[in-house]
């Protein structure tokens, strides 16, 4: 067969998984990467693992359903701002009142096809001490000099804490990934239930 018949946490990690993750991390300009069975699970697994009780997730109203479901699975409070409206985003960040917050946004929005205003989103994230996650599902292979997505397109890879991607669009396959700094990926390996309790890619 073609499956590993086990979780990545147990017997489901092969050399080809590690090689794939290294290549994906290099593509999007991050230290490390974690491959999930699907892009949907990547969003669920990342968001629900890193946002805890008393913390906030701030999302665009047009964000993908997998982002919304990840928020609902977390212990955090979800705040939604009007589509690509920076004043509305800032109001949400003010409402978070200095508590830990994660902004999650599509690089390219799946229904409208427009691009997120990442320069201003990143600036607001920095101003209010929020972390930033960009879903590159529809921008991977489309934006950026190397096709790495919206974060690369705007020169904001270093200021983007988490980059999510899927294999089901430009790459015409099945799977998804989260790329970030090594300590964050190490944390997800041990806390992301969508990874731990699912058979590997």
Annotate each predicted stretch with a short phrase:
Residues 46-65:
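Conserved PLP-anchoring active-site segment centered on the Schiff-base-forming lysine
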Residues 152-187:
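Active-site PLP attachment segment
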Residues 79-134:
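Active-site phosphate-binding strand-loop segment of PLP-dependent enzymes
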Residues 53, 74-75, 128, 159:
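Short, structured coil segments at secondary-structure junctions
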Residues 49, 65-75, 79:
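Active-site-proximal loop->helix
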Residues 62, 108, 137-138:
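Conserved Walker B
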Residues 2-39:
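Conserved N-terminal alpha-helix of the aminotransferase class I/II PLP-enzyme fold
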